[in-house]
From Swiss-Prot:
Motif PxVxL motif, residue numbers: 995-999
Species this chain originates from: Homo sapiens (Human)
Subunit structure: Can form homodimers and heterodimers. Interacts with CBX5, CBX1 and CBX3 via PxVxL motif.
Protein name as it appears in the record: Tripartite motif-containing protein 66
Domain of life: Eukaryota
ZnF (PHD-type) residues: 1105-1152
Designated gene of the protein: TRIM66
One Gene Ontology MF term: zinc ion binding
Polar residues biased stretches: 664-676
SUPFAM superfamilies: B-box zinc-binding domain, Bromodomain, FYVE/PHD zinc finger
Keywords from the named record: Bromodomain, Coiled coil, Metal-binding, Nucleus, Repeat, Zinc, Zinc-finger
Residues in B box-type zinc fingers: 105-150, 164-205
Spans traversing the lipid bilayer: none
SMART domains registered for this protein in UniProt: BBC, BBOX, BROMO, PHD
PROSITE patterns per UniProt: BROMODOMAIN_2, ZF_BBOX, ZF_PHD_1, ZF_PHD_2
Length: 1351
């Protein structure tokens, strides 16, 4: 440390000075604070505690004693590790000067007795003086000392601060060391001055201190200058480091660009070879296919004649045989004389030949790195590429003199085999050293190495000598261990006389080019060795003795020349080129190829080839995945309501379908995902929650013994009732949940445009039976919420929300427009409308089937849980109803019902749900109660099935009353539901269903007035007759209706264990009764809304969808007149040949027993009356199977199963031996197909095989496996509905593992040879793996467009 760093008495302590003081006050060895006394100061100005200093001395003494040496009194500083003599270590007196507290800023005068405040410091005597004492202060000689004035005498520190320090003389203990002897260079006192230093030069300590400070300031200034210069140097070095990093990145980019140039050239060459290979193989295959086709034609004629002769010989009629024997013999003779080329030719092989050793050696000598400037020595320049000690190579040829001259003045150049051929070969390469540009090569001493070309081609050749062209071509030749001949096969051979002039012209053109130096040892070696190069080529070998070398360009034959000595001026003239040149000239990228032998690659080459092979496979896999995504993009078009996360998971599922990777767990936040909340008993097995396509309105079927016939007259006379008026439809979203296996299946929300009528119809068309009509309730105001509830025994859900009220379902029930109403699986479709997403239960009916409509409204008057009184009963009423208002008894667990949920948006009219029934007065909805509802997510209901005692279930309705009395009144009367009981109910299971409610998010859209409708249910004045008043309030408008429950039917239903019907009677406030509907008994009454100004309205027409129900794409679509689905002609099953005229219904809506129309398809020609029935499915089974397959194709989850798995997925076909998909099934449904189905069991077997393959290949938690399970459950439900009387065997595992013996598309002869198809369309070209540049550009733009649209 320096004295300038010490704090002065009058200065404030800045933070920096405080840090320095902290450093000064710390021991360098133990890093502890120094005490006030006993510290030591080293020459390097590091400090040591007294104990630490003595410890170092003792340690040095022990070391010296151990080595039997004498300690030379040296000490090593622990801070800077410098060695000093121990005698140079002094005591740190500065610690005595350091004040223990902050020095005072105010000073007192040292002269006056009043101790006034001092203002001036006398620099001569270093005393503070006040203003008055300053005038009297003088410096005059005193008798006490001749060397210093009187004013400087006296005891110091009289007025000093606490930081003053006095040092006494060791000889005169009373004297203070205030003098400094410059002669002896030591402090002394006044007595010592008189005795020992009398003749010496002595000065006062303060004066000496001032002089020393001036000297130290000068030294400090020099140190500061030196420090600034060092900082400048450090900054320059940092800039150099940054420049080195920048140059590194720049050169690295240049190397990468060179790599890309090489890769592009290699890709072009490889593409050319592949094109050539395709041309060769296609021509060969075309000839063989023509030969095979002719053999097949002749074989069919032989079979026909042979079959006819066998039939004629075996027949009992001999006269026709004898009559036509001449014709038969003539035909046989003609066939025997027919000649056919059956010679397949000699064995044909094709292979790809190339020189891996040569190319890997050339790649190992790729480029070099040069530097300019600097003073880097040769030893400091590292060698790269394993060429240490070798001379740098330049791309040209020089004489040995030029080589020695170039080697004697080497530039700073790292070892590498090649350099770019021009000063700036491309925009990414750095320029070559200017010293290399001035070197002019003399004429080559090896004329064979010169370029043989006409003068007009010299500039073009020089222009092509760039880095991108030389790296894979001439540069490798110039850099090979033995300098080969630089062949130019694309040039004509010149006479030897012209070679020298050509070389001279070339040397003149290469004046501005960097020359290539070949080492002398390499030149000498090159004089005795002539390497043989072989470029990639394709050889087609016919037989064992024929070889044909094919290439895009003409190649010169290999020249076998003896190695000429170096002094020879000219080599022997080369052989003339072949006379025939059918191919274009060879570009510079080609060299002379050797067709005699192929040297095996070395270990390094094999390793490099393996790495290149793996990289190529990875790139191919990436391209295959991109092609797959591009090919499957049209099938992945989802609704705009889908989130990007859902789109990404869909694409990931498609990729996982190919590469067999487990997909991530589906997000729980998805609105389409419905999870099973409870597990079924162990006897049923665990079945996960499965989403189901919403386009299907089919429920899971029951057992065949669960049919419930209804004694209702047919409605053939009332089917055709249509209305010309167009009314906006109800957009609904339907989802299905089957209780038979405790599976919850929710419909995806991709298509929300679904009218209510086709959904009801599709639900009813799932079962087989005679057309029937179901009596039900007339619809209430369609703008209000309707909710159907399930029937459970001794189980009432907790309705804990006080601001919700469930409204009875008021649904119109004339199911007369449905031609096939089958009572196989009674179902209930119900939902609860609520403005709160977490409240409001909605229970399902065990035997009822109805179609509710959802709306949103604040519901009121929900009784507390304590007011809910469960009802027990032993009777069972299993009739079908259209609405239920109170849950009565437990649902029959044997009925295995399914819940259909619908969400309604922009609800308008709800009259005549099927659109074709008779018009009943009072069915229309008031316009003043319009409630648009946009419910994208319906309330999901599921059933928990604990093992309980079997209980007979009945149809009940939701209880909505304030006290038990109201509930009891309602149980005794209200709602006369007249429906015939199910006479074939099977034995009850040992389980009991307990309903529970799980609510999901509801998007509630308020009315135009901003208020939601309010529903209130109040008992009327006379509580004994069971009359209730339903009030609907929406803003300032209100409507009311009266509901009356009869008591006689209620008592019968609760007492009689037999199966009897219940009747519902609802009358209006005015006491009007609607006319009876044809086909119903007088006891069956309908619910009529009492609304002012209600008018009869026409039924709502069907609005069709905008996209095909199968492929989800647009275009020219065919609309069904009974459901909203639309189809392409080729997507429908069966595929149609033309657009029909007039009314048209799809396969899903067409009746199986009495089809409304016949399709114009290819199968129609086989169903002509006069044509013999072809072997295969019957017409009835054909329609059933087509309906099955179309239902699968219309399911959104079936998208991965529409087409076969891509052949790019190699592992799939290694695992799955018998692939199956819907396209194969649809093709085999066509009667023209040779593998046409003969029985429905074959169709079901193929469908189940498809699901089996999906489950076998994909991981269980992947999306495709989940979709396969959902689709399988959906298919089994349809199968039981369409074939309730059949039981199909499950596929065995060996069916999927074993390969098929015979071809699907071919016919097998008695000998077992699978002949290919007769027609030419059976020969399909293999899908190409390679794509051209424009196709890759299109794919890239398509992928970018898709990525932007998803963002």
């Amino acid at each position: 440390m320096s004295f300038m760093g010490l704090p002065l008495a009058g200065q404030k302590h800045c933070p920096k000075s405080g840090q320095m003081e902290a450093m000064v006050m710390t021991c360098s060895l133990c890093h502890q604070d120094l005490p006030g006394m006993g510290s030591h100061l080293l020459s390097c100005q590091h400090l040591l505690r007294k104990d630490c200093f003595q410890g170092l001395i003792q340690e040095l003494g022990q070391i010296a004693k151990a080595h039997e040496t004498v300690a030379d009194e040296l000490i090593s500083c622990p801070g800077c590790e410098r060695v000093y003599l121990t005698r140079d270590v002094t005591e740190h007196f500065f610690l005595h000067c350091v004040p223990t507290e902050q020095p005072k800023m105010a000073r007192n005068c040292s002269e006056c007795k009043e101790k006034r405040a001092a203002h001036i410091l006398c620099t001569y005597c270093n005393r503070w003086l006040c203003s008055s004492c300053t005038e009297e202060h003088r410096h005059s000689p005193v008798p006490g000392g001749p060397f210093f004035p009187r004013a400087q005498k006296g005891s110091p520190g009289v007025n000093g601060g606490p930081g003053d320090f006095t040092l006494y003389c060791p000889l005169h203990t009373q004297e203070v060391l205030k003098l400094f002897c410059e002669t002896c260079d030591m402090l002394t006192c006044h007595s010592c001055l008189v005795v020992e230093h009398k003749e010496h030069r002595c000065r006062h300590v303060e004066e000496v201190l001032q002089n020393q400070r001036m000297l130290l300031e000068g030294v400090t200034t020099q140190v500061a200058h030196k420090k600034s210069s060092l900082q400048t140097s450090a900054k320059q070095i940092e800039d150099r480091i940054f420049e080195v990093k920048h140059q590194h990145r720049k050169v690295e980019n240049q190397i990468k660009m060179a790599k890309m140039v090489l890769m592009n050239e290699l890709n072009k060459q490889a593409n050319g070879l592949i094109e050539e290979l395709e041309g060769i193989t296609n021509e060969r295959k075309r000839k063989l296919e023509q030969q095979l086709q002719s053999i097949m034609v002749l074989n069919r004629q032989f079979e026909h004649v042979q079959n006819f002769i066998n039939w004629a010989v075996c027949s009992k009629t001999s006269v026709p045989f004898l009559f036509s024997k001449e014709l038969i013999v003539f035909q046989m003779q003609r066939l025997l004389e027919t000649s056919c080329n059956t010679d397949p030719g000699s064995p044909w092989s094709i292979r790809f030949t190339w020189e891996p050793n040569f190319w890997t050696k050339q790649l190992a000598s790729l480029g070099c790195i040069t530097t300019e400037g600097g003073q880097m020595s040769r030893a400091d320049a590292p060698a790269y590429g394993g060429l240490q000690g070798s001379s740098p190579f330049y791309q040209s040829h020089q004489s040995p003199v030029a080589q020695q001259e170039a080697l004697s003045h080497p530039s700073h150049k790292f070892q590498s085999p090649a350099v770019c051929s021009s000063s700036v070969c491309c925009s990414h390469c750095s320029p070559v050293s200017p010293s290399l540009k001035g070197q002019v090569p003399p004429p080559s001493i090896h004329p064979a190495h010169s370029f043989r070309q006409p003068p007009e081609m010299v500039p073009q050749q020089l222009g092509s000598l760039q880095c991108s062209a030389l790296l894979p071509r001439e540069k490798e030749l110039a850099c090979s261990p033995h300098p080969p001949k630089l062949l130019q096969p694309w040039l004509e051979t010149q006479p030897p006389v012209e070679q020298e002039s050509t070389s001279q012209r070339l040397g003149q053109q290469l004046t501005s080019q960097p020359v290539c130096i070949v080492p002398p040892q390499d030149v000498q070696q090159g004089a005795h060795a002539q390497p043989t190069l072989q470029t990639p080529s394709i050889q087609v070998q016919f037989g064992h003795h024929q070889k044909l070398k094919l290439s895009h360009f003409q190649q010169q034959p290999q020249q076998q020349l003896p190695p000429p000595p170096p002094p020879l001026p000219h080599p022997p003239p080369p052989l003339p080129p072949p006379p025939q040149q059918p191919h274009p000239p060879l570009p510079p990228s080609q060299h002379l190829a050797s067709s005699q032998h192929e040297s095996p690659p070395g270990p390094a080459c094999s390793q490099n080839m393996d790495i290149m092979h793996h990289k190529f496979e990875l790139e191919e896999m990436q391209k295959d995945l991109e092609l797959l995504l591009q090919a499957q993009q049209p099938s992945l078009q989802l609704s705009q309501t889908k989130s990007p996360q859902h789109l990404q998971q869909t694409i990931v599922g498609q990729i996982n379908y190919i590469v067999r990777q487990p997909a991530p767990v589906q997000s729980q936040s998805q609105e389409e995902t419905l999870q099973a909340t409870d597990e079924p008993p162990a006897s049923q097995g665990s079945k996960p929650a499965l989403p189901l396509d919403k386009n299907t309105a089919a429920a899971l079927p029951q057992a065949s013994g669960e049919e419930t016939p209804l004694s209702v007259p047919p409605v053939d006379s009332t089917i055709q009732h249509s209305s010309p008026n167009v009314v906006r439809k109800h957009s609904t979203s339907l989802s299905i949940m089957g209780f038979s296996n405790t599976l919850e299946m929710e419909l995806s929300s991709t298509r929300l445009e679904r009218p209510l009528e086709p959904q009801i119809q599709s639900v009813s068309n799932l079962t087989a039976g005679a057309p029937q009509a179901v009596p039900s309730l007339l619809s209430a105001p369609p703008k209000m919420v309707s909710s159907l509830t399930s029937v459970q025994n001794q189980a009432m859900p907790s309705l804990t929300t006080s601001h919700l009220q469930t409204v009875p379902s008021l649904v119109h029930s004339t199911f007369q427009s449905m031609p096939n109403l089958i009572s196989d699986s009674p179902q209930a479709m119900a939902s609860l409308a609520s403005d709160h997403p977490q409240a409001g239960p909605s229970l399902m009916s065990g035997h009822t089937q109805a179609v509710p409509s959802l709306a949103t409204c604040p519901l009121q008057s929900i009784p507390p849980v304590s007011d809910m009184q469960p009802e027990t009963g032993s009777s069972s009423s299993s009739g079908r109803t259209s609405g239920s208002l109170c849950p009565r008894d437990g649902a029959d667990p044997s009925l295995e019902n399914a819940l259909c949920k619908m969400e309604s948006e922009d609800s308008t009219r709800f009259t005549d749900l099927l659109g074709q029934g008779p018009i009943v007065p009072g069915l229309d909805a008031p316009k003043d109660l319009a409630i648009p509802s946009e419910l994208e997510e319906p309330i999901n209901l599921s059933v928990k099935k604990p093992p309980l005692a079997p209980v007979v279930s009945t149809s009940t309705a939701l209880q909505q009353y304030q006290n038990p009395k109201e509930c009891e009144n309602f149980e005794q009367g209200a709602l006369e539901l007249d429906a015939k009981e199910n006479q074939s109910i099977r034995a009850f299971n040992s389980e009991h269903k307990i309903p529970y409610v799980r609510l999901e998010r509801l998007k509630i859209c308020a009315a135009s007035s901003g208020e939601m409708p309010v529903f209130k249910l109040k008992p009327q004045k006379n509580d004994q007759d069971g009359s209730f008043l339903l009030i609907i309030e929406c803003g300032t408008e209100s409507s009311s209706m009266s509901i009356k429950v009869s008591q006689d039917r209620l008592s019968e239903a609760t007492q009689a264990p037999g199966l009897e019907g219940r009747k519902v009677t609802v009358t209006s406030l005015a006491g009007q009764r609607p006319p009876e509907v044809e086909g119903t008994s007088p006891e069956e009454h309908r619910l009529i809304p009492r609304t002012p100004g209600a008018k009869k309205g026409p039924p709502a027409p069907i609005e069709n969808e905008d996209f095909c129900a199968v492929c989800l794409n647009g275009g020219e679509l065919l609309c069904c007149d009974r459901c909203p689905k639309v189809f392409h002609l080729s997507c429908h099953v069966p595929a149609l040949l033309s657009f029909p005229g007039g009314e048209w219904v799809c396969t899903l809506c067409r009746s199986l027993t009495q089809p409304e129309m016949e399709y114009d398809c290819e199968n129609a020609c086989y169903n002509q009356p006069g044509m013999r029935a072809s072997p295969g499915l019957s017409m009835y089974d054909q329609k059933k199977c087509e309906k099955l397959v179309l239902s699968l194709c219309c399911n959104n989850l079936s998208l991965p199963f529409h087409e076969p798995v891509s052949p790019l997925a190699r592992h799939y076909y290694q695992i799955i031996k018998r692939p199956m998909d819907l396209s194969i099934i649809r093709r085999k449904l066509q009667k023209k197909d040779p593998a046409h189905y003969t029985t429905p069991e074959e169709v079901v077997s193929d469908v189940r095989l498809m699901f089996w393959n999906c489950a076998k290949f994909n991981y269980p938690d992947s999306e495709v496996a989940e979709a396969g399970r959902c689709l399988e459950v959906f298919f089994e439900g349809w199968l039981k509905e369409i074939y309730p009387e059949k039981r199909f065997a499950q596929p065995r595992q060996e069916d999927s593992d074993s390969e098929e013996v015979s071809s699907e598309s071919g016919c097998s002869t008695p000998q077992g040879f699978p002949w290919p198809p007769y027609m030419q369309e059976g020969i399909q070209p293999k899908r190409r793996r390679r794509h051209m540049e424009n196709e890759r550009a299109k794919r890239m733009s398509f992928r970018l467009a898709n990525s932007i649209s998803q963002v």
